[in-house]
């Protein structure tokens, strides 16, 4: 802390490209993307996650836009999930399932929209790796590599020296290798067969 009374914090890292930092306040985590020279101001009224504001860092502001919406949506799903523990009528259960499903897919659509619209930002990299409870993949398993590659190609122009770009490219290489291996295994299970026609000719 530079000044405990004023709640000012100084980070001595002078990285040219933004790095991810987490500020923990009142048990809640606020992710920030900060580069050398940034002078950031954080503010909040009431619930920290729902209401915090960011000034002085464009990447942190973009990250706030994604993070607040994503976390709020995930909390909404969690609240609806607890409702299933209550004794519900068939009609109430069907209604809750419909509401839960609609919210789930809304969050997923907004996540993908953010990634595509802000593909040249490091906030998009953060969004790529966020998952709702129970989810393994971003969207649909092997097809996820399309989104990773889209962001990586954009970052080559905006942040070519970022270590997050290198990590992203390594992840894409692993995904490509897995897809290739899966394809080879599938082909091995279904060998080409040469069959004769009704006249006994191939």
Which sequence ranges carry the predicted segments?
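Single conserved hydrophobic/aromatic residue that forms the stacking wall/gate
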Residues: 1-7, 11
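Oxidative protein folding and maturation machinery
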Residues: 12-201
């Amino acid at each position: 802390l530079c000044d405990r009374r004023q709640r000012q914090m100084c980070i001595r890292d002078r990285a040219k490209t933004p790095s991810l930092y987490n500020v923990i306040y009142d048990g809640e985590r606020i992710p920030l993307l900060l580069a050398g020279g940034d002078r950031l101001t954080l503010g909040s009224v009431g619930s920290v996650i729902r209401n915090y504001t960011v000034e002085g860092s464009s990447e942190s502001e973009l990250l706030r836009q994604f993070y607040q919406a994503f976390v709020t949506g995930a909390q909404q799903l969690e609240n609806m999930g607890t409702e299933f523990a209550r004794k519900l009528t068939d009609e109430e259960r069907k209604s809750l399932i419909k509401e839960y499903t609609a919210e789930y897919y809304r969050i997923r659509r907004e996540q993908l929209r953010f990634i595509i619209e802000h593909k040249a930002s490091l906030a998009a990299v953060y969004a790529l790796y966020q998952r709702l409870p129970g989810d393994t993949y971003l969207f649909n398993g092997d097809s996820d590599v399309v989104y990773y590659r889209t962001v990586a190609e954009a970052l080559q122009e905006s942040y070519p020296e970022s270590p997050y770009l290198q990590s992203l490219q390594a992840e894409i290489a692993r995904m490509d290798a897995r897809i290739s291996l899966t394809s080879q295994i599938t082909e091995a299970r279904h060998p080409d067969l040469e069959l004769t026609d009704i006249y006994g000719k191939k």
